[in-house]
Amino acid sequence: NLGKGESVMFKILNKKVLHENILQFTLEAPLIARKAEPGQFVVLRVNEYGERVPLTIADFDREKGTIDIIFMVIGASTTVLASLNAGDSILDLVGPLGKKTDIRPDMGTVVCIGGGIGVAPIYPIARKMKQVGNHVITIMGAKNKDILILKDEMEKISDEVIVTKCERKAPKFIYGDISSLKNNDSISLFFIVLYF
């Protein structure tokens, strides 16, 4: 319990550069980690002058009390966020917010599709789908192999991983992969998150 005038800062425990403009932070946030579910997000503010930035919870560890966020540096707020390092703190972190993804053990074969930074939101969904006993096929893509994020992590939690290269607009990169799967009667659900 905090007294009047006291505040909590959220410490960055780890900073990982996934690509020159894509970063992953592990944040100390035990209350959020305890309640987080796949599909939810947080809103953060780096400092008192910063704007509020919504980011998907890309991973969480209830025992360690941590959450991971993955973001692309594309504007002033994410540039300031990217300038922080392990040991630094974020002023405000609110969450988990949003409706959790409906995940049940009776869903059968589930296809999780992520493009670009959109791989981050599907990771906790695919992991939980697998943990409860579903068959998980992951299709992931990026403009080139250097910016393909979380490939090793997705391979550990998926029954099958299909990696594609996206040279054109987002729908084109997955069209061939989905069309080969769409007539498969054993597939019961598709999750698609694309950010390029």
Which functions belong to the PLM regions below?
Residues 76-196:
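FNR/FR-type flavoprotein reductase catalytic core
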Residues 2-88:
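Ferredoxin-reductase
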